[in-house]
Amino acid sequence: MMDMKVAKKKLGIKERYAHMTRGLGWEPTYQPADAVFPYDKYEGIKIHDWDKWVDPFRLTMDAYWKYQGEKDRKLYAVIEAFAQNNGHLNITDARYLSAIKLFWQGVSPLENYVVQGFARAGRHFRGEASRVACQMQAVDELRHYQTQAHSISNYNKYYNGFHSQRHMWDRVWYLSVPKSFGEDALTSGPFEFLIAISFSFEYVLTNLLFVPFMSGAAYNGDMSTVTFGFSAQSDESRHMTLGIEAIKFLLEQDPANVPIVQRWVDKWFWRGARLLSLVGMMMDYMLPKRVMSWKEAWEIYAEENGGALFRDLARYGIRPPKGWADACEAKEHISHQVWLLFYEYGGAAAFHTWSPTDDELDWLSTKYPNTFDKYYRPRIEFLREKHARGERVYQTTLPTLCTTCQIPLAFTEPGDPTKISHRETVYKDEKYVFCSDHCQEIFAHEPEKFVQSWLPVNQIYQGNCFNPGVDPTAPDFDPLKAVLEYFRFNLGRDNGEFDGSEDQRNFAAWRGQASKN
């Protein structure tokens, strides 16, 4: 009698997850474990049981590829349709392009840093489950950069300012803000990297980035950007889960971890809040059709959601970040202060700025009844009047940069919106300047790291931001022109005033051809 074949019992979700994570691990014998994993102890974090780390999604690599493949098929169908049907002409206004340029120049390259960071963290954690989770997030972030590039590349065919992203990333002054954020995280230990990216950014602050950009894209007819946002949304839910799982895992492992984690939370909340001031400007000024104000977004996603999170973490001994109160007060001011900064330095930015219309000023007055009319409307109207007289304001001097966040000193003192916030520290006979108490404290804890900051303004003054062969002693030398050529700007096309720009003229002409006989 022949033996009957018996179907093998399929593994359940828990068993499959264990098989595809911890089942892949082994105890090293050729080298001691501390030599194989040299970085998971030097930050002072104590881990007693790596098996306590469990991914609530229990996602394994075979399932991961299946889900991502399905999403990619849908995404690239939309991208192709958008390109074939001239979807770029369906956006509300060519001013919206500046928001996408800012995202492409300043946010998308950060994805590459996060890829490197999670790949490294996955290599240096001893726990198999944490390594697999970090590996999948590294692949996620690589995919996000690729889909953003493929979605936005269609705009590069028709409009200025989308070119030379990698070249600009290492050189342009305002891009040093996200670049320094990413490099600070990337040069941290693996646990600090998790708190910086997975917790502080992905869990606490990510909605302040993705909701404004993706909702703004939907409101303004940019279906290509909306689609890559939706395609990334399910990934972001896993990333947020990794963030909360990471911090709770660290806090539950040993009481000695609490003060270390608290210091990281203080640091990275403030660094993230400063970085997102660029998003606040975009929300309040760059979207022709607005979703909500920065103030409203901060109240929902930071104060309500973040406040509930820190109340939950209080049982572990974690308090709200040191900069919490100052960041909440700044919600009334930062978007206006950053917009005015970029308006005046618009000649040195690879996107356009403009004077808001009367309707847009009225909208801002209703959204910021306590501050806008008192502090910012008069300045904007003054600049608009000068522009109408043919005296468009461009700053030709260089601003002082904060050593930590690298934003020009444009923010004001907490409690006094009429006074620029300015702090100084002398370290080894050198003077360092900061925009706030919190940036100064971050420097004070890691001075040897931040004295190495590559500050664009300082580098320009040192003569390090000119193309080879440029002679600064020549009689006709124009330093601003030389720096912008070093940035690889197409002068008069990528930068400057929106009104009368090539992007404005082309969009109007192409829209007219598409909608008229």
Where do the model's predicted regions map?
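Alpha-helical bundle segments that constitute or directly flank the non-heme di-iron/ferroxidase center
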Residues: 28, 93-125, 188-219, 273, ...
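Intrinsically disordered, low-complexity terminal tails and linkers in eukaryotic proteins, enriched
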Residues: 358-430, 448-517
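Acidic/His metal-coordination segments adjacent to aromatic residues that form catalytic metal sites
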Residues: 82-103, 164-200, 218-220, 268-289
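Conserved alpha-helical segments that form or flank metal/cofactor-binding pockets of metalloenzymes
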Residues: 30-81, 142-165, 244-246
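Inter-helical turn/loop segments and adjacent helix faces that build the functional surface
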Residues: 120-132, 154-159, 187-189, 211-231, ...
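Cys/His-rich microdomains that often coordinate metals
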Residues: 409, 439, 443
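Long, hydrophobic, well-ordered secondary-structure blocks that form the structural core
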Residues: 102-178
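Extended, helix-rich structural scaffolds rather than catalytic motifs
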Residues: 1-48, 52-53, 257-391
